[in-house]
Amino acid sequence: MSDGSVERGTKRAEDSLATHQLTVQYKRYYIDVNENTRGRYIKIAELGTNYKSRIILSIVAAKAIVSEISKMLALIDEPSTGEHAPKESSLIKSETLNVDGRKFYVDLKENVRGRFLRIAQMPMNPRQTRQQIAIPSDGIAEIHKVLTEYLAKFGEGHEQENTNTPKITAENKSFLFHSGKNDRGEFVRISEIKLNSGYRNAITVPMSALVDFRKELDNIIANQGK
């Protein structure tokens, strides 16, 4: 297994903050941390022979999945319970997560080639197909390690929702207000979520502009109906 990691910061509509590559058996995996107007997210891509699969995770979804993988690490190297390796895939442990209005399956499975981890992301639109990746046992610990490191470095202040997040609901939309801090300074992120589709958008307001931001909103409210 080989790997490489490089951090980079490009100033475009979408910023690439870090990427990690590793090769497991005949597959290549890329773990990318990106940021756009909706916030930060992690993309995990699997490249095999003539195919490519990927899943895209919000920071909060990535944290939930890493937590479940942590519980499965001890099972990776356990011997098979049967006398022979299974001819078809058998399920060892499975968890279902509901995060950001989406359902995720984290499954530790086994077949004739050995144990592997499958992470499946269900689509918001039922007419679309689900996205999933499969990681052989040789690469599970490495990917878990990289995800844990990236969440520690890039995840703070970018959790999109928790029980203490101020929330306003109006006209089939929810608005979340999250204050945080990163290497660029303090900020407030305002997320807009459409309740019927789960579509999410966000803006980030620097703390230094927050007073002026409030003044403009006060002016708009004061002039309503005039």
Curated annotation (Swiss-Prot):
Keywords: Activator, Chromosome, DNA-binding, Nucleus, Transcription, Transcription regulation. It comes from the Eukaryota. The keyword Glycoprotein does not apply. It is found in: Nucleus; Chromosome. One of its GO terms (molecular function) is sequence-specific DNA binding. GO terms for cellular component: chromosome; nucleus; P granule. Transmembrane segments: none annotated. InterPro entries: PUR-bd_fam (IPR006628). Disulfide bonds: none annotated. Disruption phenotype: Sterile due to lack of oocytes. Defective locomotion, marked by a 3-fold reduction in speed. RNAi-mediated knockdown causes embryonic lethality. RNAi-mediated knockdown substantially reduces expression of end-1. RNAi-mediated knockdown abolishes formation of endoderm in 3% of embryos and in 35% of embryos on a mom-5 mutant background. The keyword Membrane does not apply. One of its GO terms (biological process) is regulation of transcription by RNA polymerase II. Signal peptide: none annotated. Probable transcription activator. Binds telomeric DNA containing repeats of the sequence, 5'-TTAGGC-3'. Binds to end-1 promoter, activating end-1 expression, which is required for endoderm specification during embryonic development. Belongs to the PUR DNA-binding protein family. This is Transcriptional activator plp-1. It comes from Caenorhabditis elegans.
